[in-house]
A protein has these predicted regions:
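Conserved catalytic alpha/beta core of Sir2/sirtuin-type deacylases, generalized to analogous enzyme cores
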Residues: 1-144
């Protein structure tokens, strides 16, 4: 949602909760790249005149169906699945690690505190992702 993965160079992203740096029409759900600067707040869709909004999933809204299906497929075909920094409480996204487990993947959870997922995963690592992930990468890439 915050665009950090894309700015880090990742090209193959499934943004289940959207992207704060994209805009869409409130009524038509169509992406809007640009609009006339009329000074109106919020800005209006150049196609239909309705208000524009960030292209994110707000509480109570459904996840984008195509993106969710792609994420489900990725989870079901993964060899290793990382669940990082999530409460593991909000479905349907919280189901993804369980799909990976059911398909035989190694599931690694990284979180400051245990979650409902913790007892089910292959590895539950409690701590800050900013500390644990660099340590994992260093360990994987260290010479034998």
């Amino acid at each position: 949602m915050d665009g950090l993965h894309r700015r880090a160079g990742n090209q193959h992203l499934l943004e289940l909760h959207g992207n704060l740096f994209r805009t869409k029409c409130f009524s038509e759900e169509r992406p809007v790249e640009s609009w006339p600067d009329s000074g109106e707040i919020p800005p209006r869709c150049p196609h239909c005149g309705n208000v524009l909004r960030p292209d994110v999933v707000w509480f109570g809204e459904s996840l984008p169906v195509a993106t969710l299906h792609a994420a489900e497929h990725a989870a079901a075909t993964a060899e290793v699945f990382f669940s990082i920094g999530t409460s593991a409480l909000v479905y349907p996204a919280a189901e993804l690690p369980f799909s990976a487990l059911a398909a035989g993947a190694t599931v690694v959870e990284i979180n400051p505190h245990p979650t409902p997922l913790s007892a089910h995963v292959s590895y539950s690592l409690n701590g800050a992702a900013g500390v644990i992930l660099p340590a994992l990468v260093a360990r994987v890439w260290e010479p034998a």
